Amino acid sequence: MTAIPPQLIVEPDDGLEPVHAFISSAQRSLLIKQFTFTEPSLIAATIARRKAGVDVRVMLNAQRSGGDRANDDTYQELKHAGVDVQWSSPHFYVTHEKSIVVDEKAAMVATYNLMIKYFTLTRDYGIITHDPVHVQQIIDVFNADWGHREFTPAEDGGLLWSNSNSRYQMARFIDKASETLHIQH
């Protein structure tokens, strides 16, 4: 069986379509964890999946570090449509993660929020992976955060998790560079 290669999404070049298509591809389950989720067509796609019988859970960051609450309207709209939605874990100052998991088989991790400006004005990236180890780890963290439980990542899980292993893993990655290292921040 051939592994499905990762799909890179480059914004603003690729626009909304790859994200919309990914959300719309969910047949059994859809997990969305977002720092900011206000883009109307993506909210509608999420609600459409719920209306199609998909088990949808959405976790939103309650407020930004400055105190503004960008997700309140989205929270209410999703809740009203029957989507299982809740605020992210209070264990963290903010939840800055941007992830979407479809059918427990594929995960999108991105630097962009689900807001129109990230698909039209800013340089951001996303990747869709089918790597079962990575997908499962994203699900495990989602479930831990959903239940407000601690999560300790595996040392070599392949993913970096802030407040856990990110500094160690990032330093290890940088140390492995033998000729070049390109960083965009």
Each model region followed by its residue ranges:
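HKD-type phospholipase D/PLD-like phosphodiesterase module
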Residues: 1-27, 33-178
